[in-house]
Amino acid sequence: MSFETPDFSLALPEIWLLAATCGVLVVDLFSSDPRRSATFYLTQGALLVTAVLALSTQWGVNEVTFSGHYMADSLGAVVKASVALLSVLALAYTRPYLGDRGLLQGEFYLLALFANLGMLVIASGGSLLSLYLGLELLSLALYALVAYHRDSRQAAEAAMKYFVLGSLASGILLYGMSMVYGATASLELSVIAEVAGRHSDPLMLLFGVVFMLVGVAFKLGAAPFHAWVPDVYQGAPTPVTLFLSTAPKVAAVALFMRLLVDGLGPMHEQLEPMLMILAVASLLVGNLIAIVQTNFKRMLAYSAIAHAGFIMVGFTAGTDAGHAAALFYTIAYSIMAAGAFGMITVLARSGFEAEEIADLRGLNERHPVYAGVLLLVLVSMTGIPGTVGFYAKYLVLQAAVEAGHIPLAIFAVVAAVVGAFYYLRVLKVVYFDRPEAEVDADTLPAPGASSAIRSLVVVNGVAVLVLGIFPERLIALCQAALGL
């Protein structure tokens, strides 16, 4: 019997983040600072180092270790770096909000670190086992984060819904994995792909793939498995919603790629009709229901469902170009979502959450910088030419057309036009509606945090603007990660 010695150097990002999380836990345990400065800066530093390690140790590599359970490649490197950097951006918005409400505890940052560890494991998952373990580590941390505000009935209700539906989706995914294992006699994605190409025991394999697709679609928030998204986005504390709408989206796309592309790519022909249904349903449900929303967070939740539909359009193409477009779309959307939800955290104060669209009345008169950033973000989400959102939609649609899915591409364009209505409605409120006196007093930035937050808002807006003017670097990075 031969024993393969694992190459621990390939798993350096995960090893570092686990060690750093333990270090942050110890430091926070002995910290008496109510602002948790050491915990915050150590968390941000750990995530930045993780991004550097991911790109430096795994870019251009294509190796499998830990008996096939761990895969080090360029796709994993890009996903890990994106997840870590998006988490840094999301967590930077949270500190004033949490401090203003007496919620600034070390547990928030520790849960975010454990969630990142789960996302890193997903990004390099080389088997069904490692992917499921990474997913559960991520999910458990997110369940706890949604319930982080213990005194909020809304947060408790959202957490319960998320936990129950998430557990059901995880069970369905696990059942699908068990059927795939039964049909292929292996947990390794490379072996599963080889067997799937030969169509061994196709009926059991196909049923397993359907269950797995349902589980992954739930994690991505695609219709008709989207029931948790509006309630969780609205009920969770805004910093948690901000985090939930950024890095975990990239991890969900990575899970999709590992399971249904690396593992079950040869079965794309059978998957194609199901992927198309998910894309159409998400575009339809997300855009139509978002139109009637008055709560800004809930509107953005349905917007996220619609964006998941565009991501599914990229996967429906079934080509490397389509997969690269889906990855680029997810990263671009996450940056835009950080700006949108970040704006809510900036404008909110204790006793006033700034969650209603009406709360944004006359924002341009009170805070023109914030209004300008929100304009950039929402115009980009709409997909106006010259923005990063336009390039994201263009690449996805191009991949769909090249794959012969012209009716699907036309439907996606029509859905995007419909979706423009609710984004422009918010901008109309921001720029043309008069502010109410009582709202004007409440929506000032949190005391002592205005300069730091203003800088962060500007950085987020500049990132959206620069990626819209110069998208080539990020597009090339995503394409190189897929071997293009």
From Swiss-Prot:
Uppermost EC category: translocase
Main location group: membrane
Enzyme Commission number(s): 7.1.1.-
Membrane topology field: Multi-pass membrane protein
GO CC, any one term: plasma membrane
Cell membrane is among the record's keywords: yes
UniProt cross-references to InterPro entries, sorted A to Z: NADH-Q_OxRdtase_suN/2 (IPR010096), ND/Mrp_TM (IPR001750)
GO molecular function: NADH dehydrogenase (ubiquinone) activity; NADH:ubiquinone reductase (non-electrogenic) activity; quinone binding
Localization (cell): Cell inner membrane
Membrane-spanning ranges: 10-30, 40-60, 74-94, 108-128, 129-149, 163-183, 203-223, 237-257, 272-292, 299-319, 327-347, 370-390, 404-424
Keywords: Cell inner membrane, Cell membrane, Membrane, NAD, Quinone, Translocase, Transmembrane, Transmembrane helix, Transport, Ubiquinone
A biological process from GO: ATP synthesis coupled electron transport
Reactions listed under catalytic activity: a quinone + NADH + 5 H(+)(in) = a quinol + NAD(+) + 4 H(+)(out)
Protein task: NDH-1 shuttles electrons from NADH, via FMN and iron-sulfur (Fe-S) centers, to quinones in the respiratory chain. The immediate electron acceptor for the enzyme in this species is believed to be ubiquinone. Couples the redox reaction to proton translocation (for every two electrons transferred, four hydrogen ions are translocated across the cytoplasmic membrane), and thus conserves the redox energy in a proton gradient.
NCBIfam families per record: NDH_I_N, PRK05777.1-5
Oligomer and partners: NDH-1 is composed of 14 different subunits. Subunits NuoA, H, J, K, L, M, N constitute the membrane sector of the complex.
Family according to the record: Belongs to the complex I subunit 2 family.
Protein's name according to its UniProt entry: NADH-quinone oxidoreductase subunit N
Native source species: Halorhodospira halophila (strain DSM 244 / SL1) (Ectothiorhodospira halophila (strain DSM 244 / SL1))
